[in-house]
Amino acid sequence: MRRTTALMAVVCLCLLSLNAYAQKKKPTPTPTPSPVEQDDVVRISTELVQTDVMVFDKDGKFVSGLKPEEFELLVDNKPQPINFFESVVTGGKAEERMLRAAGGKKSSQPVEGESTSEVGRTVLFFVNDLHLEPGSIARTNKTISNFIDNMLGPNDQAAITSASGQIGFLQQLTNNPAVLKAALERIKIVPGATPDSQRPYISPYAAYLIVERHDRDLFNAFVDQTLKANSMRDPDDRPIASSMVEQRTRTMLVLSDAAVKNALSSLVNLMRSTSKLPGRKLVFFISDGFMPNLTGSDFTTMMDRATGIANRSSVVIYSIDARGLSTDSMFDASSNGGFDPSGIMQSRLSGERTFMQEPLHALAADTGGRALLNSNDLAGGIARALDETSRYYLLGWRPENDAQRASNFSKIKVTIAGRPDLKVQLRRGYLGAPPEKSKATAQPTSVETTDVLGVTESSSEELRAAVALGYKRTSGANMQLTSTAQVSAQSPGDNGGAIVVNVLGAVYDSNGKAVGSFRQRVEVTRTRANEPPVYTNVNHQVDLPPGLYQVRVIAAERGTNHLTGVMDWIEIPKVKEGAFSISSLFVGEITQAGGAAQIGVNASRRFARSSRLRFTTNIYNAATPVQLGLQIKILRGKQVVLTPPEITVGPDKISNPANSPYTLEFPLSALSPGNYILELTVTDRTKKVSASQQLSLTVY
């Protein structure tokens, strides 16, 4: 699993244990800042602010190879020198360092083998299920499912979130397709999301025109349709119908405003959570559109808050109208009182779609994205957005006054000199907010948790954790989940020695219910920056039924506020008793240290090219006499780069056909540095059935 500085918080038992541990610590006294320290704090006011820019030609293709002197930056309509310039690949190995450099910040310590790391993209789907019709939900599910199957890269991190929160515990970043599909299955019609089920149907836009724009002609048209729909033929019934329409329209606006507030509040929380994630993030905001500003509503404030936090968090929003080219239900006679011979309803409501799409335009434009509207090719829109945002130019410039330092400052214009044919796409604002002038000393780092994505930041760059998950059969169809938490520590200087670390872990099912936990205090050897890490392992096993599970681990250095964490998912399949199958791959590394082979579990899945990969799987219910074929494949992305000859395994190698471990070794010297997928397929030639397992690994 990819390790980033953005980590999943350990909750429930883990956080309770950690809080108890923290309460035992004595508070650290705040030292009096020296003049040098005070100068350092004040000096950060001269840091650069960052503007990310995408440049496209007339065909919508990204224009690469531009030089800094070709960019013209205007701030407050005044030319501004560009102090930092870089062409960036989204999710590339250097993106986070470039973002820090553009802000004038010191680069964090590079992790071991970082030069070969392929980080991948961060993609989030915000499904505004409070404003989705049933047909739109079906299209949304199909579109996101296509992304999972065909567009999710091996190094990407993705999450599916919703305005209603109905996804629950599965609303988390992951690279596991099973988790994403399970989250997608939870997107259903939200009860009460369609505020009007009576006839004739009155949309929020129609209610807006009647109540706030005082459109009497439209009001009377709905009164006429109400009379028809309810077979009210007596002239004395008209006041009753008028009262019904008036009450329905006012109720409609109240409910619509509440739904909009809830949706934007969920979006704000998501944007806050993404601030803990490194690099630039792409968010797809999927909705049928919704009502913009109403009288007395704080719509504008909430929109500004959402886009402001998005800009500070390096988020680009691409909004998608899930309706595609479908016909509005307002013009469906089956959902109304009947045909409107006056034509008033069709005339007045013809601008509804455009009006409801205004927030989609605003969210995208303010964050440097685009609104993908009026198209049935939703999957194609997502593919184009992924391509458009895959590269960008990062400009750093120095603000001249406090107004320009404000994160919501938007008087920024970028053009390409002498190239009016090129389109420059940028956000209204900039990436992040420069630190404010302050003479206060830095306080010890604390850990903050959020409800969205479960993201928190590590408080230590020296302390690192990894976790490897697997499953195997215990007896019959029963399964055991195995966890190996691996902790290492790096000295910020030349000091070695050892530290004491509390390792806490918890196992959760797909509903967030704790089904297992572990805690252990270990001693971790601290290595110098130029030395390979020394790992300390903590193992845990728990018997569980088939299902989707998450293991979260947090490691806290005793006596300090250094803390780090990691999480991963695993799906334990449901296998019939007696069926041919294999367990997970349990992987280790063989290195040459001190002239002797050293073998150990490698939870980080990072391997030196000079080492050999050793992995074990358990083979279950092979036919007798045993005739198995074992095929290894090495993939980079979705492309096979290496296929060693198939290995034949006979009865002499399998002592127990019902349950027998089998170990293989594979030299890594033939692989160039990078990220790979190891795939093992075991074929029972007698039964003519196969079983496969995969694991990701990084070679450096």
PLM region spans:
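Bacterial N-terminal signal peptides that target proteins for export
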Residues: M1-M8
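Bacterial N-terminal signal peptides
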Residues: M8-S17
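Scaffold/interface architecture of coatomer-like assemblies
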Residues: Y21-Y700
